[in-house]
C-alpha cells in the first residue's frame, strides 16, 4: 500500500511537472512570437465622435471605420468627444513610454474654453490643481490664438451668446481620465473643444482629420 501511494504521488508530481513545462513552453513561444513581430506605429488624426477602440456593440464609429491595420492598440485614450493625435502600436515599451507618468513624456493639447482665464487661473493650472483623484503635476499653460491649421468640427461646438471663448495650449506630463476637461472646469472655464497635437516626438503634422499613416519605428527610439 505504501508503494502504491508513493507511485501515485510520483505520477501526480510528474503530471504536474509536465503540465507546468507545457504551459511554460507555450508562454515562452507566445512571447517569442510577439518579440519577433515587426514593431508597428500608426498615427491617426481622430475625428470628433469616434471611439478610441476597434469594436463597439452599440454600432458607434470606431477606429475600425478608418484604420485597416490589425494588431495595434492605442497608447493612452482620447475621449470620444476629443479630437486629434492617437498613437497606435504593438510595441509595449513604446506604449509605456508614452503613457506612464514616471516617463514624463509631454503631451500637447489645444483647448478651447469658455471665457478668458485670468492670471490666477492660468497660474493655478501651471502649478497644479487638486482634483477628486489628487493634485495634478505642474503643466505648461499658454493663451494662444486659434490654430490656423485647425479643421472645422462637425457638429460645431455650442457657444453661449455674450460669453467669449479663448484657446489654451496645454502641455501635460501625465494622463488621467478627462484630465484637461476637469482641470479647466476646476478653474471656472469649461472645455468646449479639445485637440491633442502631440505625444512625445509624434505630432499631427501632415495628417488631415480622419487620416492615418504608418511610420517606421527607430530601434532605439
Swiss-Prot record:
A Pfam entry, by short name: PseudoU_synth_2
Enzyme Commission designation: 5.4.99.20
Family the entry assigns: Belongs to the pseudouridine synthase RsuA family.
Reactions catalysed according to its record: uridine(2457) in 23S rRNA = pseudouridine(2457) in 23S rRNA
GO molecular function, one term: RNA binding
Protein name from the UniProt record: Ribosomal large subunit pseudouridine synthase E
Residues annotated as the enzyme's active site: 79 (nucleophile)
Gene3D superfamilies documented for this protein: Alpha-L RNA-binding motif, Pseudouridine synthase I, catalytic domain, N-terminal subdomain
UniProt key word Isomerase: yes
Domain of life, source organism: Bacteria
Entry keyword annotation includes Hydrolase: no
GO biological process: pseudouridine synthesis; rRNA processing
Keyword field: Isomerase, rRNA processing
Function of the protein: Responsible for synthesis of pseudouridine from uracil-2457 in 23S ribosomal RNA.
